[in-house]
């Protein structure tokens, strides 16, 4: 898709969202806030275009970011801030990621309707919901049992039947359902976990923040070619909660 056609799509998307907010505010009180969030994501994409390698994210990603109800994935006390372009606390020392980062990570995976994706770090379930709009199946692992249970119930209530959540140490992946077309890790690891590399399908992509909690973390893109060789590329400096577990 050309840059011109991408821009036209986004203009239409934002205008339709604004109209929906004006006409159906009673039905969707968050419509205007979601439209503002989408604009801010686009602004961040332009600002970081040299790092992410593009001036605009996939229009499919933006359409889904505009549609998935982020307010359903944050605690009641944080709902007034649900569509601000920043992370929010969800309890147990964890956060729901900044919408811009969620959009970039989803875009970089380059997954499709037949893809199977592994998510390490379910958290609130928001990233899993975004992915579920694109792919056939999402397998999500959360080490904190209470978060895993709440996220699973929430995703089921919202109709995301193609997401499966379990409690466990995501460092080791989910071997029973490997290999995966894409892997997204939503907590920072000190290194790229070898089990996740093993479970990435040839031709697949993994997006993972790497670095310690007291050092600069880098969002890394890992690509595995058809011969099983991997290459990595730094995308952005980021700040994620640490990946926990027995590794």
From Swiss-Prot:
Report the EC code(s) recorded for this entry: 2.1.1.77
Pfam families to which the protein is assigned, alphabetical = PCMT
Gene3D superfamilies, per the entry? Vaccinia Virus protein VP39
Please list the coiled coil stretches.
Answer: none
Stored CDD domains: AdoMet_MTases
Report which superkingdom the organism of origin falls in.
Bacteria
Q: Disulphide bridges in this chain?
A: none
What protein name does the entry list? Answer: Protein-L-isoaspartate O-methyltransferase 2
Phylogenetic lineage:
Bacteria, Pseudomonadati, Thermodesulfobacteriota, Syntrophobacteria, Syntrophobacterales
This protein's gene is called: pcm2
């Amino acid at each position: 898709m050309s840059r011109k056609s991408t821009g036209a799509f986004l203009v239409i998307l934002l205008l339709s969202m604004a109209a929906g907010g004006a006409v159906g505010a009673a039905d969707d009180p968050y419509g205007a806030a979601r439209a503002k969030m989408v604009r801010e994501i686009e602004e961040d994409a332009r600002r970081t275009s040299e790092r992410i390698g593009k001036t605009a994210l996939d229009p499919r990603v933006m359409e889904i970011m505009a549609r998935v109800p982020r307010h359903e994935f944050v605690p009641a006390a944080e709902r007034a801030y649900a569509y601000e372009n920043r992370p929010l606390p969800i309890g147990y020392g964890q956060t729901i990621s900044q919408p811009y980062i969620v959009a970039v990570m989803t875009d970089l995976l380059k997954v499709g309707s037949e893809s199977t994706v592994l998510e390490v770090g379910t958290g609130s379930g928001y990233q899993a919901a975004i992915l579920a709009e694109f792919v056939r199946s999402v397998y999500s692992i959360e080490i904190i049992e209470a978060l895993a249970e709440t996220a699973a119930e929430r995703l089921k209530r919202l109709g995301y039947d193609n997401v499966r959540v379990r409690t466990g140490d995501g460092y080791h992946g989910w071997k029973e359902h490997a290999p995966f077309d894409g892997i997204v890790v939503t907590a920072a690891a000190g290194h790229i976990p070898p089990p996740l590399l093993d479970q990435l399908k040839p031709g697949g992509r993994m997006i993972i923040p790497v670095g310690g909690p007291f050092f600069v973390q880098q969002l890394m893109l890992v690509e595995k070619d058809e011969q099983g060789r991997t290459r990595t590329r730094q995308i952005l400096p980021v700040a994620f909660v640490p990946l926990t577990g027995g590794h």
